Amino acid sequence: MAVSKESTIFPVGTIFVDRGNYLTGDSVILFYQVVRCTERTVWYLQNRAQVVAYDSAALRKDLVPIADTYNPKAKPHMARILREKTFHCVKSPTGDVMLPWDGQPVSQYYGY
């Protein structure tokens, strides 16, 4: 069996953003951070979950990942790296496509 080589497609520390919903109907913004990446697979941990209210004009402007929010007992998610025409992406635990975070504060109109 071939051993997968480490890759820099998504370097360790890369942040992904995803949006989800709780059963109560509240929206939540999730930040995931890459902990390992090979040629075909990426492992990432959730490092922030922030409930947001869409009845407000916009989300909090300081909604960015918090690097020191880390649960040592958390198990990383594993996802296959998907290749679209000109870029790579991964799927979130809920099955939505995630792209790397662009470094801008997340707003109500953030493009996922």
Model regions: which residues?
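Mixed-charge, low-complexity intrinsically disordered regions
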Residues: M1-F31, T41-Y112
